[in-house]
C-alpha cells in the first residue's frame, strides 16, 4: 500500500533532497578546488621530472653521484622528522583506517623523487603523485574542518587529480583511488568528486601542453579461439611476473634492512650497486623511468633480458631508500615482457606489449577496472577483447600479492566470500 501523502512527508522529502543538493554543490566546489591546486602541483612535478631526466640524459656521469643523492634523501627525511615514512601505504591506510597524513609528505616526496631520477635511480613517478595528491588532499580536508569520512574523500580527490595531471589518463585517475584501497569494494561516494578533480587536473595539464601517453598497436589480429588461447597464456605468465616484481620489491627492502642497519649506509650502498650494475649493462636504459624503452617495445624491439633487469634495478633502488613510484617501472616490465613473448611466438609483439602493460599493472595493483580504463586511454579501443581477457586472468591468478602492503583484499578472487586480508 502506498504511503499517504501528508504535509510532514512532503516537507521531509524536500529537506532530504535539499541536503543531497547541498552535498552535491559542496563536492563540486571542493573537487574543482582540489583539481586546480593539486593539478598545478602535479604539473610542476611533471616539468621537474622532465628537467631532471633531460639533465641526466645529457650528463650521464651524474649517476656516479647516486650514493650521495641517497644520503641527501635520508637526511631530508630525518630533518623533517619522517624517518618512518611508508609512502603510498600511508595514503591507503589513511583512507580505510583513518591514519593521519602529514603535509610534509608532499614536499618530501616531490624533492626526493627528483633527486632519485636526477642521479639515475630506477623508479617511477605516479606513486609519488599519489603521495603528493593524498597528502595535500588530506590537508585540505583538515583546513576545511571536514569530518573523518569526508576527509577520506578529499584524499581520494587529491590522488585522482595528481595522477590525472601527471599521467594524462583522467578515466583511470578517477577510478583508481576508489578501487585500489579496498579490493572488492568500490568507494562510490567519492565517484563524482574524483571524476571532477581528475577532469579539472587533466584540463590544466592540456593547457600546459602536457601530452597524454599514447602507443600505437601496429598489428591487431582477429579475435578467435586460437588468439584467445595465446593471450590467456600470456596473461598467466604476466600474473607470475607481477608476483615476482612484488616479491622482489618487498624482499629487497627486507634484505637491505637486515644486513645494513644504518639508513645512510643503506642508501649509499644501494647507489653503489646501481652504479655497478649500470656499468656492467653498458647503458642507462634501466635507470630512471624507462619511458623511452617502452616506446621501443611498440616498435617491436626489446632486449630479451629487459624485463628482468628492470625488476632488479627498481627493487634495488626503492629497497635502498630512494623515492619514486612503481607504476611506470611496471609498464616497462609489462611492455618488455609482452614484446618478448610476441617475438618468440610470432603473435603481434606490439599487441603483446600492450597486453603485458595492462596485465602486469593489474597484477601488481589488483585494480582490473582501472587497468581496463588506462588501457583504453593509452591504446584505444580496438584491442578491447584481448585486453579484457588478459586483465581478467591476471587479476585472478596474481593471487594476493601487491605493491602496497596496506592495500586490503576484501573479497576472495576465487569465491564470493568476504576475506578482508592485506596483500603480501
Walk through the language-model features, giving the residues of each.
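Alpha-helical transmembrane segments and immediately membrane-proximal extracytoplasmic
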Residues: 1-424
Amino acid at each position: 500500500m502506498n504511503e499517504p501523502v501528508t504535509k510532514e512527508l512532503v516537507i521531509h522529502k524536500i529537506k532530504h533532497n535539499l541536503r543531497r543538493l547541498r552535498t552535491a554543490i559542496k563536492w563540486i566546489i571542493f573537487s574543482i578546488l582540489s583539481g586546480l591546486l593539486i593539478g598545478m602541483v602535479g604539473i610542476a612535478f611533471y616539468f621537474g621530472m622532465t628537467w631532471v631526466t633531460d639533465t641526466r640524459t645529457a650528463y650521464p656521469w651524474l649517476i656516479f653521484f647516486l650514493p650521495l643523492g641517497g644520503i641527501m634523501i635520508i637526511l631530508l627525511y630525518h630533518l623533517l622528522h619522517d624517518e618512518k615514512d611508508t609512502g603510498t601505504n600511508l595514503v591507503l591506510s589513511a583512507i580505510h583506517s583513518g591514519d593521519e597524513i602529514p603535509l610534509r609528505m608532499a614536499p618530501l616526496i616531490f624533492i626526493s623523487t627528483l633527486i632519485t631520477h636526477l642521479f639515475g635511480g630506477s623508479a617511477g613517478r605516479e606513486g609519488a603523485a599519489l603521495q603528493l595528491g593524498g597528502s595535500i588532499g588530506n590537508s585540505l580536508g583538515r583546513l576545511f574542518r571536514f569530518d573523518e569520512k569526508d576527509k577520506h574523500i578529499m584524499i581520494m580527490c587529491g590522488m585522482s587529480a595528481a595522477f590525472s595531471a601527471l599521467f594524462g589518463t583522467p578515466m583511470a585517475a578517477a577510478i583508481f583511488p576508489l578501487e585500489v584501497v579496498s579490493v572488492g569494494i568500490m568507494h562510490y561516494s567519492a565517484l563524482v568528486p574524483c571524476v571532477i578533480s581528475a577532469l579539472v587536473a587533466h584540463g590544466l595539464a592540456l593547457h600546459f601542453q602536457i601530452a597524454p601517453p599514447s602507443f600505437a598497436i601496429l598489428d591487431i589480429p582477429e579475435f578467435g579461439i586460437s588468439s584467445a588461447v595465446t593471450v590467456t597464456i600470456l596473461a598467466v605468465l604476466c600474473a607470475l611476473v607481477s608476483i615476482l616484481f612484488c616479491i622482489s620489491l618487498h624482499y629487497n627492502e627486507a634484505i637491505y634492512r637486515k644486513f645494513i642497519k644504518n639508513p645512510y649506509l643503506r642508501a649509499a650502498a644501494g647507489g653503489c650497486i646501481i652504479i655497478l650494475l649500470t656499468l656492467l649493462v653498458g647503458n642507462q636504459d634501466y635507470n630512471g623511468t624507462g619511458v623511452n624503452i617502452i616506446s621501443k617495445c611498440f616498435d617491436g624491439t626489446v632486449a630479451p633480458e629487459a624485463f628482468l633487469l628492470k625488476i632488479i634495478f627498481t627493487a634495488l633502488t626503492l629497497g635502498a631508500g630512494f623515492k619514486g613510484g612503481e607504476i611506470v617501472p611496471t609498464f616497462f616490465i609489462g611492455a618488455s615482457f609482452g614484446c618478448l613473448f610476441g617475438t618468440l611466438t610470432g603473435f603481434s609483439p606490439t599487441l603483446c606489449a600492450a597486453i603485458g602493460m595492462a596485465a602486469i599493472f593489474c597484477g601488481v595493483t589488483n585494480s582490473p577496472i582501472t587497468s581496463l580504463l588506462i588501457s583504453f586511454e593509452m591504446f584505444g579501443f580496438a584491442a578491447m577483447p584481448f585486453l579484457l581477457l588478459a586483465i581478467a586472468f591476471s587479476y585472478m591468478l596474481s593471487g594476493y600479492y601487491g605493491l602496497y602492503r596496506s592495500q586490503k583484499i576484501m573479497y576472495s578472487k576465487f569465491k564470493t566470500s568476504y576475506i578482508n586480508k592485506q596483500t603480501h
